[in-house]
Amino acid sequence: MTKEKVFKKKSSILEWGKAIVIAVILALLIRNFLFEPYVVEGKSMDPTLVDSERLFVNKTVKYTGNFKRGDIIILNGKEKSTHYVKRLIGLPGDTVEMKNDHLFINGNEVKEPYLSYNKENAKKVGINLTGDFGPIKVPKDKYFVMGDNRQESMDSRNGLGLFTKDDIQGTEEFVFFPFSNMRKAK
């Protein structure tokens, strides 16, 4: 093999190596700062999100703080490997209260249309979907969350407590698996 062919072969290998390194760096940047896939574990968000569904999470809101009441958010648990998928209910400074299956934020009733299926099922068996609680004043720099499956969810009401902005990993963007059920959860 001539020196020219050896040089071209090494040059070609270097070009492929550069392309692979750039692709890996881009993938890491996208995953760490823009979007990341998550797997729903458990029943706390049924039927909005069901166990084993896979969703993409928009991580940009973690840096912009651009999340709002009603968003489905992914939270870090106390252990690094634990994540929770919950609905953002109370923002810093809010007063959260549940009376007779109606949510009140700062004294104003907040409609929760995403709970209609679960509320109908609870009424069929003669119970409220969500037990009364509060009023709870959400401290500065804290967030109050609940699962949509209020009977099955561990959340800010009953064990998980309140979360900080740093605990929020992002908002649910869309469900991508199973493919037959791709959608934007509401």
From Swiss-Prot:
GO molecular function: serine-type endopeptidase activity
Membrane topology of the entry: Single-pass type II membrane protein
Membrane-side (Extracellular) residue stretches: 36-186
An example Gene Ontology CC term for this record: plasma membrane
Catalytic activity: Cleavage of hydrophobic, N-terminal signal or leader sequences from secreted and periplasmic proteins
Main location: membrane
Keyword Cell membrane annotated: yes
Segments crossing the lipid bilayer: 16-35
EC number(s) reported in the record: 3.4.21.89
Cell compartments where the protein resides: Cell membrane
InterPro entries linked: LexA/Signal_pep-like_sf, Pept_S26A_signal_pept_1, Pept_S26A_signal_pept_1_CS, Pept_S26A_signal_pept_1_Lys-AS, Pept_S26A_signal_pept_1_Ser-AS, Peptidase_S26
Residues forming the catalytic site: 44, 86
Keywords from the named record: Cell membrane, Hydrolase, Membrane, Plasmid, Protease, Transmembrane, Transmembrane helix
NCBIfam families reported for this sequence: sigpep_I_bact
Cited PANTHER family: CHLOROPLAST PROCESSING PEPTIDASE, SIGNAL PEPTIDASE I
Name used for this protein in its record: Signal peptidase I P
Protein species of origin: Bacillus subtilis subsp. natto
Lineage, broadest ranks: Bacteria, Bacillati, Bacillota, Bacilli, Bacillales
